[in-house]
Regions:
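Intrinsically disordered, low-complexity terminal regions
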Residues: 1-242
């Protein structure tokens, strides 16, 4: 399918696999392996639609130009995106999501892990059972899991994280604000040097470990970060990292 400057692909399948690969500029190619006779691929403007009415398994491979918008709705299909995309939205009952980079990210799953190298803009991920692991988040993020770990290598925007029974780790926090909650997990945060920390933290049966004060001869702070943490039976550790 030849497409214009704002292409998108919407995929609906009950089970199977969805794979997005790098393709040629201005061209979207879709290959479908399914026994569902109602499954079809259609086009509406620059939007390519691939779905079936009766459910069933379908393995869908998309070759698309970079920064295309991808939307997937599935009951139990894994989603793998190997090329940078613009907006990535995935709604599933169970299934893992793996991606390279996305301009914006939104995922919702009852059971599944989310892994990606980076999100340039906003990210919103909700899963009942599964880890959330993302390299770099460039803007605001809202991440929630009931029984999984949340691991972010770097966040440059406001970050809100909640986990009932998992650990929360932010390798380097440079955004202005972090709100973190966990019932039976710990929180570990890295902050850059020359950061003024505004901390509001509480834990019922855990420990709080903070970096040493810079001292009177230290250089003035370059940024201020507000951190609010609520824990029940977990530890909080904050380190200074380069």
């Amino acid at each position: 399918f030849p497409v214009g400057d704002s292409p998108s692909v919407k995929i609906g399948t009950r089970s199977g696999r969805v794979r997005v690969e790098a393709g040629e500029p201005g061209i979207v190619r879709i290959q479908v392996d399914t026994r569902n006779p109602t499954f079809e691929v259609t086009r509406r403007g620059d939007a390519i639609l691939a779905s079936g009415e009766r459910g069933g398994r379908a393995d869908v491979t998309v070759q698309a130009p970079s920064m295309i918008d991808i939307e997937v709705s599935t009951a139990s299909a894994d989603v793998e995106v190997l090329t940078p995309v613009g907006r990535l939205e995935v709604a599933s009952a169970s299934g893992d999501v793996a991606f390279d980079t996305a301009g914006r990210l939104q995922t919702k799953s009852a059971s599944g892990t989310v892994r990606g190298n980076g999100v340039e803009g906003e990210a919103r991920c909700i899963t009942a059972s599964g880890d959330i692991r993302i390299g770099v988040i460039g803007d605001r993020a809202d991440l929630s899991t009931a029984s999984g770990d949340v691991v972010i290598e770097q966040c440059r925007g406001e970050l809100s994280v909640a986990s009932l029974s998992g650990d929360i780790r932010v390798g380097q926090l440079t955004g202005p604000e972090l709100n973190a909650k966990s019932v039976s997990g710990g929180v570990r945060i890295g902050i850059p040097p020359r950061t003024r920390l505004d901390l509001d933290a509480s834990t019922l049966s855990g420990k709080v470990s903070l970096p040493p004060s810079p001292g009177p001869s230290a250089e003035p702070p370059e940024r201020e970060i507000s951190v609010k943490v609520r824990l029940v039976s977990g530890n909080l550790r904050i380190d200074r990292v380069d």
